[in-house]
Amino acid sequence: MVTLPLLLSILPLAAVFSSAASLQVRENHDCASIQPPQVPGAEILSVIGVQRRVEVAPFPPSPSKPNTTIDICSVNVTLSHMGVNDKVVVSVWLPLPDKWNGRFQATGGGGWAAGTFDLLMGPAALEGYSTAGTDAGVTVDPGSADKWALKEDGTVNYDLLENFASRSIHDMAIVGKAVTESYYKKPANYSYFYGCSNGGRQGMVEAQKYPDDFDGILAGAPAIYWPQFLTSTEWPQVVMQSEKVFPSQCVFEAFRKAGIAACDKLDGVEDGVVSNLDGCEFNPFALVGKKVKCGEESTTITLAQAWVAKKIYDGPKSTAKHALWDVLPVGASYVGLANSTIENGVPKIAPFVIGSSWIRSFLKKDVNFDLSTITYADMPKLFQQSIDEFDKIAGGSNPDLSALKKSGTKLLSWHGLADELIHPQGSIKYRQAVEHRMGGGSEVDNYYRLFLAPGVTHCGIGVNDGAAPIDTLKVLVRWVEKGEAPETMPATATDASGTTTLFTRNLCRYPLVPRYKGGDKNSADSFECAKDFGSHH
């Protein structure tokens, strides 16, 4: 039974990888004498720098790749915003001077954690980047905001929400670049942001509000339209609770596989991946009466289970059948949002922790609120309340990228088409809104490009049906530093061990799609980026 969704499995619940070791200080690069940075609107409380030897785990996580040990200067800058009474920690890791590549990389968070720290900072430092992460002054708990969302009087803590939503990412850029310059005695040649999920949202917010912070921003699977996205994660739970039907993950997996089988060929090649989502129509009721093997036993799909699967696939709707948010993409897993559990023989909902924290703390303003009481009729009201109260501060979906265009900064985004948590339609919707606002696709391509990855899960972590992008940051660096605007992004599908490549693909620049030309379907060379998939029946 999966109790914590995939999103949390990629996040360290505590930064515990590191062990300190004393090292000789080289040349004039004194880790203990970092100059306090100047942060507008904030007071620096402390700057503590120590030489450390840290163990870096590979990212994405891989059981076959060993950890690596590197020496760094580790600097913690603690600051407080004027009149807020918060305490924000920005952690900066600096490779020793002979290992520095001359670049700075800020790293993003995931879930309710503003920073993932070691998880992303370690690999960045290993590549030679000076790198930073921030806790935004909130608890480093990716699963919940319950401990900080509300003030003692029961009202929303808008100061900390603003930290989490945008302010602390900007602060991290200022602090990280200043500490980098203080240590190496010269500024970074180029600065980058790297994040996925909430980290992707952070990157999009930087592009919208503070584009001068970075030369390049990589935003994977961005959790933009944050109020709508988080509210929508409760929909599968409302469906199961309302219908009093709680299909097992094995039954849900049968529906997922049937959806892939129904739509796989629409892109011209049968490869276990749905690339043509727009042309895909899947009828869950076709499975009624079919037997599926679940462990040692077989079970028969019921009409009630198919009805639940259909309602979840169709996405949140009002009682008048008005769409409130996006549908679950065919091929995406139900695991994560449609979990249930059994207590004393009785099936119960098991809500997605990140979304349930949103509803409890920010919408209901009651950390003890019982989510099982939410009905179909409640959903439109929750969506509207979410937008009304929080879109301005946390939406991350402003299509006006005038400042980004003017800054010269490049924004590179990608999204898995089988993202089970943050559905890819949000990224497509946002890109279309930007095109409408900023003068069309070819104009926007000068500074913002989107790549879609068929069959790829949330942030590409774990086993994917499709090919997940690799070397995404290198693609961005080439665009920023050499002017090589990407038409494609390399991607690979691997086995569960992560060591064997099953097939390769080139992800296409939106709105182009991968059209099969013929030949070995496991080779990226057998596909071309085209305006459509061609005619297939």
Curated annotation (Swiss-Prot):
Keywords for the protein's UniProt record, in alphabetical order: Calcium, Carbohydrate metabolism, Disulfide bond, Glycoprotein, Hydrolase, Metal-binding, Polysaccharide degradation, Secreted, Serine esterase, Signal, Xylan degradation
EC number of this enzyme: 3.1.1.73
GO CC entries: extracellular region
Catalytic activity reported: feruloyl-polysaccharide + H2O = ferulate + polysaccharide
One GO biological process term: xylan catabolic process
Main location: secreted
Name of the protein this chain belongs to: Probable feruloyl esterase ARB_07085
Binding site for Ca(2+): 264, 267, 269, 271, 273
InterPro entries associated with the record: AB_hydrolase_fold, Tannase/feruloyl_esterase
Family: Belongs to the tannase family.
Signal peptide: 1-22
GO MF, one annotated term: feruloyl esterase activity
Location in the cell: Secreted
Presence of the UniProt keyword Calcium in the record: yes
Glycan attachment residues as annotated in the record: 67, 76, 189, 339
Active site as annotated: 197 (acyl-ester intermediate), 419 (charge relay system), 458 (charge relay system)
Entry function: Hydrolyzes the feruloyl-arabinose ester bond in arabinoxylans as well as the feruloyl-galactose and feruloyl-arabinose ester bonds.
Pfam family, one: Tannase
Cystine connections: 196-459, 263-280, 508-529
